[in-house]
């Protein structure tokens, strides 16, 4: 079995394990810790975003999305980061026609990633 096949990221869709560890200068333990912290801190992000939008607080929703975009990109969660970017752009540009579907897609991917991270 190759090293790639034994890396947890090779079995977690949406997690580029190799890139994430490389960003941390090879510190796999730190990467695992950051992924666990991400799962604990952002599991309810979609709910917070929806709550802000329901309250008419588009700035808070945008800020949440912007932060989530940066965190997911820095953790090498590219598919999720792309969906967060789409949601962020929809909110930023008041694209109310598409923002719910973007947030729904982001929420599904976020839930899947967090569920898979719980297997680490």
Task: Annotate each predicted stretch with a short phrase.
Residues 1-120:
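Two-component system phosphorelay core
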